[in-house]
Design a protein with these regions (language model features):
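A short, Lys/Arg-rich alpha-helix, primarily the initiator
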Residues: 1-18
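P-loop NTP-binding core
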Residues: 2-5, 34, 38, 44-328
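DNA-binding alpha-helical recognition surfaces that contact promoter or target DNA
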Residues: 9, 13, 27, 34, ...
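Generic structural marker for isolated residues within well-ordered, non-membrane alpha-helices
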Residues: 11, 22, 271
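Surface-exposed, Lys/Arg-rich phosphate-binding patches that contact polyanionic backbones
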Residues: 16, 24, 215
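Residue-level detection of the helix-turn-helix DNA-binding "recognition helix"
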Residues: 16, 30, 41-44
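Short alpha-helical "recognition helix" segments of helix-turn-helix
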Residues: 23-29
């Protein structure tokens, strides 16, 4: 690995550990936000830029100063970010991406997965025996006590079952709006990331997911109607912010999924159009169609694609997508 990649990776690590925005790094180091954005890119991306060693030295000095002033400050203020995977349209691979990103993150971070899709496909992939699920999304919304299912030392799961739809119908929409946000608060100091798999349709639970989230991740396919629906997501997020329901929410990443390679002309036109409309949110790396992705999430396997098929090209694609999400 080259020295510049090591420097860039270290700056990314500082950004994540101290929950800094790109604008924060620019303010601390004195470099422009545009420069910082290029440091956050992967080495293979077009506008990737080597971060100067001086920037890293300034950040290290900032960390030392911060620690000497308040050595327990970072631990006390540690709070998980909430990433929600959603799209109004089903069949875009939303759950598959949430599954893999959750497992990949849990290699080095503590992750809590919450299944808010009544279909429960993510729950089925992570909890092989439904009888092992002692605490569900319905329990969470109702404020009941319980412990998430332990998939591994670093990965907890709050799965869903058939009661979720009835539970949501029994709660007034105005109350449900904030219940998810309020009831996951206790987990924010226990985990580094909380990942929510949202249902693929609008409604009170969908709004509750938006109210609870920091980052919205939107998988989509190179389908004209699918791409048109992306604007709806941005409008919903804007509405949530304008109504002061959640001012800390943003659409962080649009992930092109199930892309046939080499790209067909029509697919390229659709993806170029999305890139033009949403240049900051559009992930430059695509996820290919692969039977391996169906295999790895089956309950009998339940492994991240990077473990199940580490040499497959789709594993490298997922690593790049994860990097984009974390640094968005």
């Amino acid at each position: 690995m080259s020295d510049d990649v090591c420097i860039n990776d270290r700056i990314k690590e500082i950004k994540e550990n101290f929950n800094l925005k790109q604008s924060d790094i620019a303010s601390i180091t004195g470099y422009s936000v545009n420069s910082v954005k290029k440091w956050m890119m992967s080495e293979t991306q077009q506008y990737y830029q080597k971060a100067p060693i001086q920037a890293l030295k300034i950040l290290d000095s900032w960390i030392n100063t911060k620690a000497s002033i308040d050595p327990v400050d970072n631990e006390d203020k540690k709070t998980a970010d909430v990433l929600s995977f959603l799209n109004f349209k089903g069949g875009v691979g939303k759950t598959t991406i949430a599954f893999n990103i959750s497992l990949m993150l849990s290699k080095t971070k503590k992750v809590l997965v919450i299944d808010c899709d009544p279909q429960g496909h993510l729950s089925s992939s992570l909890i092989k025996d439904p009888n092992d699920m002692e605490y569900s999304t319905s329990d969470l919304l109702m404020g009941r006590r319980g412990e998430p299912y332990s998939y591994s030392e670093n990965l907890g799961v709050i799965g869903t079952d058939r009661t979720l739809s009835n539970t949501c119908e029994s709660i007034p929409a105005s109350d449900l709006l904030f219940l998810l946000k309020e009831n996951i608060e206790k987990y924010k100091k226990q985990y580094d990331h909380i990942i929510i798999d949202s249902l693929p349709s609008k409604g009170p639970l969908y709004d509750a997911v938006l109210a609870a989230s920091n980052k919205i991740i939107v998988p989509f396919t190179a389908d004209l109607y699918d791409s048109w629906g992306l604007q709806d997501v941005f409008q919903q997020v804007k509405k949530i912010k304008l109504r002061k329901i959640n001012e800390n929410i943003k659409v962080a990443a649009l992930i092109p999924n199930r892309v046939d390679k080499p790209l067909r002309n029509f697919d390229r036109t659709v993806l170029d159009s999305v890139q033009s409309s949403f240049p900051n949110e559009m992930c430059p790396d695509y996820i290919s169609n692969s039977v391996r992705l169906k295999e790895c999430k089956s309950p009998a396997v339940s492994m991240a694609i990077t473990d199940y098929a580490p040499t497959d090209k789709v594993s490298d694609e997922y690593k790049k997508v994860l990097n984009f999400i974390i640094n968005s």
